[in-house]
Amino acid sequence: MSGKGGKAGSAAKASQSRSAKAGLTFPVGRVHRLLRKGNYAQRIGSGAPVYLTAVLEYLAAEILELAGNAARDNKKTRIIPRHLQLAIRNDDELNKLLGNVTIAQGGVLPNIHANLLPKKSAKATKASQEL
Protein backbone atom coordinates (compact mmCIF):
# COMPACT_ATOMS: atom_id res chain seq x y z
CA MET A 1 0.00 0.00 0.00
CA SER A 2 1.10 3.48 -0.71
CA GLY A 3 -0.26 4.82 2.54
CA LYS A 4 -2.62 7.33 0.92
CA GLY A 5 -5.76 5.52 1.96
CA GLY A 6 -8.71 4.65 -0.20
CA LYS A 7 -9.37 1.50 -2.16
CA ALA A 8 -6.54 -0.05 -4.08
CA GLY A 9 -7.05 -0.27 -7.84
CA SER A 10 -10.14 1.94 -7.95
CA ALA A 11 -11.06 3.28 -11.38
CA ALA A 12 -10.18 6.89 -12.12
CA LYS A 13 -13.14 9.26 -11.95
CA ALA A 14 -14.17 10.83 -15.25
CA SER A 15 -13.10 14.46 -15.55
CA GLN A 16 -15.78 17.08 -15.13
CA SER A 17 -15.76 20.45 -16.90
CA ARG A 18 -15.76 23.67 -14.91
CA SER A 19 -19.13 24.49 -16.45
CA ALA A 20 -20.57 21.25 -15.08
CA LYS A 21 -19.01 21.86 -11.66
CA ALA A 22 -20.58 25.32 -11.53
CA GLY A 23 -23.92 24.08 -12.90
CA LEU A 24 -23.71 26.31 -15.98
CA THR A 25 -24.51 25.76 -19.64
CA PHE A 26 -22.17 28.40 -21.08
CA PRO A 27 -18.49 27.35 -21.43
CA VAL A 28 -16.29 28.51 -18.54
CA GLY A 29 -13.11 27.33 -20.26
CA ARG A 30 -13.79 29.38 -23.37
CA VAL A 31 -14.53 32.51 -21.34
CA HIS A 32 -11.28 31.95 -19.42
CA ARG A 33 -9.35 31.61 -22.68
CA LEU A 34 -10.93 34.79 -24.07
CA LEU A 35 -10.08 36.69 -20.88
CA ARG A 36 -6.45 35.56 -21.15
CA LYS A 37 -6.14 36.32 -24.87
CA GLY A 38 -7.92 39.68 -24.59
CA ASN A 39 -5.10 41.30 -22.57
CA TYR A 40 -7.55 42.65 -19.99
CA ALA A 41 -5.05 41.92 -17.20
CA GLN A 42 -1.74 40.11 -16.76
CA ARG A 43 -3.32 37.45 -14.58
CA ILE A 44 -6.85 36.04 -14.43
CA GLY A 45 -8.11 34.42 -11.23
CA SER A 46 -9.79 31.03 -11.31
CA GLY A 47 -13.15 32.38 -10.09
CA ALA A 48 -13.42 35.29 -12.52
CA PRO A 49 -14.38 33.28 -15.63
CA VAL A 50 -16.93 31.26 -13.64
CA TYR A 51 -18.60 34.42 -12.33
CA LEU A 52 -18.53 36.14 -15.73
CA THR A 53 -19.98 33.04 -17.40
CA ALA A 54 -22.80 32.91 -14.85
CA VAL A 55 -23.61 36.58 -15.48
CA LEU A 56 -23.63 36.08 -19.27
CA GLU A 57 -25.86 33.03 -18.96
CA TYR A 58 -28.31 34.87 -16.70
CA LEU A 59 -28.54 37.87 -19.06
CA ALA A 60 -29.08 35.62 -22.07
CA ALA A 61 -31.82 33.67 -20.28
CA GLU A 62 -33.54 36.87 -19.14
CA ILE A 63 -33.54 38.46 -22.60
CA LEU A 64 -34.65 35.24 -24.32
CA GLU A 65 -37.51 34.77 -21.86
CA LEU A 66 -38.83 38.29 -22.47
CA ALA A 67 -38.32 37.93 -26.23
CA GLY A 68 -40.22 34.63 -26.17
CA ASN A 69 -43.10 36.35 -24.41
CA ALA A 70 -43.07 39.10 -27.05
CA ALA A 71 -43.10 36.49 -29.82
CA ARG A 72 -46.00 34.67 -28.18
CA ASP A 73 -47.92 37.96 -27.85
CA ASN A 74 -47.51 38.40 -31.61
CA LYS A 75 -48.68 34.80 -32.20
CA LYS A 76 -45.26 33.73 -33.53
CA THR A 77 -43.22 30.66 -32.66
CA ARG A 78 -39.83 32.02 -33.78
CA ILE A 79 -37.96 34.85 -32.06
CA ILE A 80 -36.84 37.53 -34.51
CA PRO A 81 -34.82 40.72 -33.86
CA ARG A 82 -38.07 42.69 -33.53
CA HIS A 83 -39.03 40.57 -30.51
CA LEU A 84 -35.60 41.16 -28.95
CA GLN A 85 -36.03 44.91 -29.46
CA LEU A 86 -39.50 44.92 -27.90
CA ALA A 87 -38.30 42.82 -24.95
CA ILE A 88 -35.31 45.04 -24.20
CA ARG A 89 -37.01 48.42 -24.68
CA ASN A 90 -40.08 47.50 -22.58
CA ASP A 91 -37.92 46.41 -19.61
CA ASP A 92 -36.54 49.33 -17.58
CA GLU A 93 -33.32 47.66 -16.37
CA LEU A 94 -32.43 46.05 -19.70
CA ASN A 95 -33.20 49.29 -21.52
CA LYS A 96 -30.83 51.14 -19.20
CA LEU A 97 -28.12 48.50 -19.67
CA LEU A 98 -28.51 48.32 -23.46
CA GLY A 99 -29.59 51.92 -24.06
CA ASN A 100 -26.87 52.68 -26.61
CA VAL A 101 -27.20 49.36 -28.45
CA THR A 102 -28.72 49.28 -31.93
CA ILE A 103 -30.45 46.03 -32.86
CA ALA A 104 -30.44 45.43 -36.61
CA GLN A 105 -33.95 44.89 -38.02
CA GLY A 106 -35.36 45.71 -34.58
CA GLY A 107 -37.60 48.63 -35.52
CA VAL A 108 -38.87 51.12 -32.96
CA LEU A 109 -41.38 51.00 -30.15
CA PRO A 110 -44.91 51.89 -31.23
CA ASN A 111 -45.64 55.39 -29.95
CA ILE A 112 -48.07 58.07 -31.12
CA HIS A 113 -47.68 61.56 -29.68
CA ALA A 114 -50.78 62.76 -27.81
CA ASN A 115 -51.12 65.87 -30.01
CA LEU A 116 -51.47 63.70 -33.11
CA LEU A 117 -54.34 61.61 -31.78
CA PRO A 118 -57.82 62.56 -33.06
CA LYS A 119 -59.70 64.90 -30.76
CA LYS A 120 -63.03 63.85 -29.36
CA SER A 121 -65.82 65.61 -31.23
CA ALA A 122 -68.45 67.70 -29.47
CA LYS A 123 -71.22 65.35 -30.68
CA ALA A 124 -69.60 62.33 -29.06
CA THR A 125 -69.12 64.20 -25.80
CA LYS A 126 -72.74 65.45 -25.80
CA ALA A 127 -74.11 61.99 -26.56
CA SER A 128 -72.17 60.42 -23.72
CA GLN A 129 -73.41 63.10 -21.27
CA GLU A 130 -77.05 62.50 -22.20
CA LEU A 131 -76.80 58.79 -21.37
Swiss-Prot record:
Q: Where is this cross-link: Glycyl lysine isopeptide (Lys-Gly) (interchain with G-Cter in SUMO)?
A: 126
Give additional notes from the record: In contrast to vertebrates and insects, its C-terminus is not monoubiquitinated.
Among the GO biological process terms of this entry, one is: heterochromatin formation
Post-translational modification Phosphoserine, affected residues = 128
UniProt PTM comment: Phosphorylated to form H2AS128ph (gamma-H2A) in response to DNA double-strand breaks (DSBs) generated by exogenous genotoxic agents and by stalled replication forks. Phosphorylation is dependent on the DNA damage checkpoint kinases MEC1/ATR and TEL1/ATM, spreads on either side of a detected DSB site and may mark the surrounding chromatin for recruitment of proteins required for DNA damage signaling and repair.
Q: Which SUPFAM superfamilies match?
A: Histone-fold (SSF47113)
Q: Output the CDD domains linked to this UniProt entry.
A: HFD_H2A
Where does it reside?
Answer: Nucleus; Chromosome
Q: Which GO terms describe its cellular component?
A: nucleosome; nucleus
Domains: what does the record tell us?
The [ST]-Q motif constitutes a recognition sequence for kinases from the PI3/PI4-kinase family.
Give the protein's function: Core component of nucleosome which plays a central role in DNA double strand break (DSB) repair. Nucleosomes wrap and compact DNA into chromatin, limiting DNA accessibility to the cellular machineries which require DNA as a template. Histones thereby play a central role in transcription regulation, DNA repair, DNA replication and chromosomal stability. DNA accessibility is regulated via a complex set of post-translational modifications of histones, also called histone code, and nucleosome remodeling.
- Is this entry keyworded Acyltransferase? no
Q: How does it assemble?
A: The nucleosome is a histone octamer containing two molecules each of H2A, H2B, H3 and H4 assembled in one H3-H4 heterotetramer and two H2A-H2B heterodimers. The octamer wraps approximately 147 bp of DNA.
Q: What is this protein called?
A: Histone H2A.2
Residues the record annotates as the site (Not ubiquitinated) are 119
Record PTM N-acetylserine, positions in chain: 2
Its source organism is Eremothecium gossypii (strain ATCC 10895 / CBS 109.51 / FGSC 9923 / NRRL Y-1056)
Family under the similarity heading: Belongs to the histone H2A family.
Species classification? Eukaryota, Fungi, Dikarya, Ascomycota, Saccharomycotina
